[in-house]
């Protein structure tokens, strides 16, 4: 099936291309130098030579198995706009080393025992010398070797029944940021383990290394908790749950590909399903009408409402057991505990909260501080190296925010773009960027709440100005749709000083699942997530100081085809004509308009 797809994809690409074929991978390496000696063929069974490390050996088998199975040929190579001086094909030497073959991959690793945790070294070198019979890879850790393998996958192509790679090639590569990821939401709609594996495959190919797993929310509770098995009564069905064995499968699959899995249990907001099955008294406003038909009185930003009653002492005993049980399953040092979108009106439905606020003229900010003071020490003690993550709302929300949050807690910034990143880093916090205006992959698909009279408009009320149904966002609060160029061109450290830039530790692109499930998740995630992958691996600026968006275009179009060939149902970004005719679909002929 895949081979048939690739046969049609390859078409006539290499019919007249006996010259060198330099296929630049995605993400672009930090340093790559191609020679001009012509192609070198690879043996059909390139042997592994290196440490007897199970993770590396398994990764090599997957890598070479993929190369052999896919027999990949890109639909079109990187190319300058027509009439520009060519720079990607070689000097015309034809099959210069057809009598020589690459027989093995030689791997050297300084330390194969380094755990896959935050900050692990992922650097590598990959070298194929002129007329050599081996591919040489060096790395400081196992995880660097895995990154080298994914680069190798993309630079080997299939031509006339043989595998070839241009040589010599010398790559020295490492990531700009230690956190490079995507977020999946398995509460609004369930995502199967099989589809999670598919996202992990895409992540591995694009060198993303953190899967942020937003497991629970108000709508459903799909994860089994040993202390409270009744919580999954609020799953959508018995089959739409994750048991400990399911989670371990995801963790093992991810780890084999150099990907960390960071769980999120969103608290104290977005908390109704599951929790109410333990004790309805620990959940506030779950039975309220979420919008109250009057936005000033809303108890939630979307249906269904519910927040943990953080003035109720019983809440903390339950939270501790749930958190401890889930922490035992996940192996990463990090754990995300939410903290976003708390609604004061929800808390006001609780008599316990109202009585608490009356004592000493307390405020909602004091109430959230009470939650932070009670839960943070409890959550940190579970694991020696535990680090907590929270959404930025806990510090920056206009509704309610804590006065003090320990600075070792990592803040995930989703609102306010550059301004909020600046505020957080200036206060000394490490920050993960997830700005909705640039990185939310669910935006731009229109509204989803029902019984909405705003759509009942037959004539444009203001032809001169974009509005709800005519040129506006159509109910998508974070519209418009985030194109790959929007993502790729995001300079999220703009305006920060040196110290503040050092506190930005990476970026994660969320895909909230109000309108996503198994059927469409890969289509919405990919290949746009690959634009973020390059942004946080090697940046969006070339050695000449100019943005390389125009060079990225052909690589991401080819990468989309590569994802599909690997079983990842990525969406097309342009008509296929554009893929096969590089730059023919650019808005401007002038390739320097993006600086």
From Swiss-Prot:
This protein's UniProt keywords: Glycoprotein, Glycosidase, Hydrolase, Signal
CDD domains with a match to the protein in the record: GH20_HexA_HexB-like
Any one annotated GO CC term: membrane
Gene3D superfamilies xref list: Chitobiase/beta-hexosaminidase domain 2-like, Glycosidases
Annotated catalysed reactions: Hydrolysis of terminal non-reducing N-acetyl-D-hexosamine residues in N-acetyl-beta-D-hexosaminides
Signal sequence region: 1-20
Pfam families for the chain: Glyco_hydro_20, Glycohydro_20b2
Gene Ontology MF annotations: beta-N-acetylglucosaminidase activity
Protein name: Beta-hexosaminidase 1
Assigned protein family: Belongs to the glycosyl hydrolase 20 family.
Keyword match Glycoprotein: yes
Native organism: Coccidioides posadasii (strain RMSCC 757 / Silveira)
Glycosylation sites: 313
EC nos: 3.2.1.52
One GO term of the biological process aspect: carbohydrate metabolic process
InterPro entries: Beta_hexosaminidase_sua/sub, Glyco_hydro_20_cat, Glycoside_hydrolase_SF, Hex-like_dom2, HEX_eukaryotic_N
PANTHER family (alphabetical): BETA-HEXOSAMINIDASE, BETA-N-ACETYLHEXOSAMINIDASE
Induction: Expression is induced by N-acetylglucosamine.
Function: Beta-hexosaminidase that shows a broad substrate specificity.
Domain of life: Eukaryota
């Amino acid at each position: 099936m895949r081979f048939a797809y690739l046969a049609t994809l390859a078409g006539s690409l290499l019919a007249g291309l006996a010259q060198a074929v330099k296929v630049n991978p995605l993400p672009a390496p930090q340093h790559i130098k191609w020679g001009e000696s012509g192609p070198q063929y690879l043996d059909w069974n390139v042997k592994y030579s290196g440490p007897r490390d199970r993770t590396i050996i398994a990764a090599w088998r997957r890598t070479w198995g993929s190369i052999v199975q896919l027999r990949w040929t890109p639909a079109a190579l990187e190319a300058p706009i027509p009439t520009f001086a060519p720079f990607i094909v070689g000097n015309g030497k034809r099959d210069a080393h057809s009598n020589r073959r690459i027989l093995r991959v030689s791997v050297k690793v300084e330390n194969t025992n380094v755990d896959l945790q935050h900050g692990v070294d992922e650097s590598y070198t990959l070298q194929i010398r002129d007329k050599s019979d081996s591919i040489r890879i060096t790395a400081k850790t196992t995880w660097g070797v895995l990154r080298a393998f994914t680069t190798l996958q993309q630079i080997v192509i299939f031509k006339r029944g043989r595998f070839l790679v241009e040589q010599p090639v010398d790559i020295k590569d490492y990531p700009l940021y230690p956190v490079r990821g995507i977020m999946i939401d398995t509460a609004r709609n369930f995502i199967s383990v099989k589809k999670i594996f598919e996202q992990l495959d895409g992540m591995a190919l694009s060198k993303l290394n953190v899967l942020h797993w937003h497991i629970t929310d108000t709508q459903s509770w799909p994860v089994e908790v040993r202390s409270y098995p009744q919580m999954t009564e609020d799953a959508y069905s018995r089959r739409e749950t994750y048991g400990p064995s399911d989670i371990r499968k995801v963790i093992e699959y991810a780890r084999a590909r150099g990907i960390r899995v960071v769980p999120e249990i969103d608290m104290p907001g977005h908390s109704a399903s599951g929790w109410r099955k333990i004790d309805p008294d620990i959940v506030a406003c779950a039975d309220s009408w979420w919008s109250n038909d009057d936005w000033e009185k809303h108890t939630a930003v979307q249906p269904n409402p519910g927040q943990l009653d953080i003035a109720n002492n019983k809440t903390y005993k339950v939270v501790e057991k749930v958190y401890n049980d889930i922490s035992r399953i996940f192996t990463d040092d990090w754990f995300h505990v939410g903290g976003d979108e708390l609604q004061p009106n929800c808390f006001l439905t609780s008599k316990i909260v109202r009585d608490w606020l009356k004592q000493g003229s307390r405020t909602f900010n004091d109430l959230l501080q009470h939650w932070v003071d009670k839960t943070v020490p409890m959550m940190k003690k579970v694991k020696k190296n535990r680090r907590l993550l929270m959404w930025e709302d806990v510090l920056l929300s206009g509704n309610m925010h804590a006065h003090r949050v320990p600075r070792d807690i990592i803040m995930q910034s989703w609102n306010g773009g550059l301004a909020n990143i600046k505020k957080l880093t200036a206060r000394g916090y490490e920050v993960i960027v997830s700005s909705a205006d640039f990185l939310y992959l669910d935006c731009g698909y229109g509204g989803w709440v029902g019984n909405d009279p705003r759509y009942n408009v037959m004539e444009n009320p203001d032809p001169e100005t974009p509005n709800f149904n005519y040129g506006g966002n159509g109910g998508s609060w974070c519209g418009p749709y985030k194109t790959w160029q929007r993502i790729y061109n995001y300079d999220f450290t703009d305006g920060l000083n040196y110290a503040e830039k050092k506190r930005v530790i990476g970026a994660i692109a969320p895909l909230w699942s109000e309108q996503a499930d198994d059927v469409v998740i890969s289509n919405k995630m990919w290949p746009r997530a690959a634009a973020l992958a390059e942004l946080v691996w090697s940046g969006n600026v070339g050695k000449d100081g100019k943005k390389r968006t125009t060079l990225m275009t052909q690589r991401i179009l080819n990468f989309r085809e590569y994802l599909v060939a690997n079983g990842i149902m990525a969406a097309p970004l342009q008509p296929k004509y554009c893929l096969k005719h590089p730059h023919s679909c650019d808005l401007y002929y002038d390739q320097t308009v993006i600086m």
